Amino acid sequence: MRTALITAALALAVFWTTPAFAAGTPSPKDAYVYFIWPSDGAVIHGGKFWVRMGLRNMGISPRGVALSDVGHHHLLIDTELPPLTEPIPSDRNHLHFGAGETEARIELPPGKHTLQLLLGDHNHVPHDPPVYSKKISIIVQ
């Protein structure tokens, strides 16, 4: 009996100490996010340009709105995907579009850059399964 109580207590302790975001908000398996513009290999003249973001089989909502099958865009610039069970960082390499934007005008210095989209839930955590685009490369002149 005592062993059963200790086992149950340990199981409960593990359950209660696991972060709430460890299992992301569910997403449809056929959902995908993509770039409308720019396209892979695009050459951008001047540092400022529009990024237009698309999403299929899910909807866009602002941060803080906890509905099923919705999220908001995050643009990853010159970086790898962050840990997919944690909130997406907010810095110069991880731009948040928490108001539900589907396009943005950004500025990058001259050179080769990579861009990738990652959809986040109401808490900026990637969905489960995560919804992200292929990484594209652009050149800014």
Which ranges hold each PLM region?
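Short coil-to-beta strand junction motifs in C2/discoidin
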Residues: 65-73, 132
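N-terminal signal peptide c-region/cleavage motif recognized by signal peptidases
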Residues: 17-19
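Short beta-strand elements
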Residues: 129-141
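Short amphipathic, basic-aromatic surface patches that mediate peripheral association
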Residues: 54-65
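Short, compositionally biased P/S/T/A/G/V-rich stretches that sit at domain boundaries
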Residues: 23-46
